[in-house]
């Protein structure tokens, strides 16, 4: 007896293998037909650079005998690295991330945004509604740029008012020194 798919049992097996291959590989592909895709290019801000920023900010906080959390985001708002100093509260990571995210989307220091928000609270209404619970209009978030190109942001939380940004700037200063040393 002949099957609708061909002349006997082998055609059914071949058809089954082809169907399984199509399901495993996706449409328009077969096993071994396509070379592996290259890895995505690394972010402009490397993990090593993020750690340099964090280490600079942590050194500043230690010098002042303070505890804090610091977060580094890439240009798309994705986490590169974060540190919570021993004894710093667990909720500070979210706060630091919110500050970094806010400085990233505003392309400005969150301390500047906080000052502008005092005189005109409606200024950031749209962005706060677009990102509910993610925008923090308090100091401690600073954008990161290389050759005037935004590459990420740093956010610091847990320090007294005005000191968060100083810690972030200390981290950025350490990063700038690191970048300068790499050029030599």
Stretches with model-predicted labels:
Residues 1-9:
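N-terminal secretory signal peptides that target proteins for export/translocation
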Residues 31-184:
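Flexible, solvent-exposed loop/hinge segments and secondary-structure transition points
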